[in-house]
């Protein structure tokens, strides 16, 4: 079977393309999948070719982001590509990352942190913490961790209003909770 994009090479990969409410499967050759074919915009930016080493994963990541954004009524193109911010290390933009399907280097995570958090929050309906199922053995640990975090926030507020006596009591409670947490960790 010939590649559905270039009609020149033998098709080797099956790619699912999702746009609006329509999912379409395409059979493409390795050349088209890797972005070396003229129909692919990545060919215009050869310095980013090194970031395209695992194309099947890249397609999957890109498709997941596009699907989730579309499902929740978000125009992924508009949200993701508002500005052309570049990573100081690898010089990739958010558009390049979405096109390739993965980050170019470790600094990309810090550079695009706010943009990615915004997209994930919109897709997840405002939730940024895991709220799904957890193993029963973890319930006590998670509850204890949350209690320590709440006490730390309360301690900061007490220090801000200079209620040092109450802050000392809360500090001691936090120490006790941390000790309890370490005991549970050692038992596990």
Swiss-Prot record:
Keywords: Metal-binding, Stress response, Zinc. GO terms for molecular function: cadmium ion binding; cobalt ion binding; copper ion binding; DNA binding; zinc ion binding. The keyword GTP-binding does not apply. InterPro entries: UVR_dom (IPR001943), YacH (IPR025542), Znf_PARP (IPR001510). It holds the Pfam family UVR. Induction: Up-regulated by heavy metals such as Cu(2+) and Cd(2+), but Zn(2+) and Co(2+) have no effect. Forms part of an operon with ctsR, mcsB and clpC, which is repressed by CtsR. A motif (CXXC metal binding motif 3) lies at residues 87-90. One of its GO terms (biological process) is stress response to copper ion. PROSITE patterns: UVR (PS50151). Residues 145-180 form the UVR domain. A motif (CXXC metal binding motif 2) lies at residues 29-32. A motif (CXXC metal binding motif 4) lies at residues 105-108. The keyword Zinc applies. A motif (CXXC metal binding motif 1) lies at residues 3-6. Interacts with McsB and CtsR; the CXXC motifs are needed for the binding. Activates the phosphorylation activity of the protein-arginine kinase McsB. May function as an important molecule for oxidative tolerance in various types of stress including that of heavy metals. Binds to Cu(2+), Zn(2+), Co(2+) and Cd(2+) via its CXXC metal binding motifs. The mutant where Cys residues of three CXXC motifs are mutated to Ala (Cys-3, Cys-6, Cys-29, Cys-32, Cys-105 and Cys-108) is still able to bind Cu(2+), probably via its fourth CXXC motif, but loses the ability to bind Zn(2+), Co(2+) and Cd(2+). This is Protein-arginine kinase activator protein. It comes from Staphylococcus aureus (strain NCTC 8325 / PS 47).
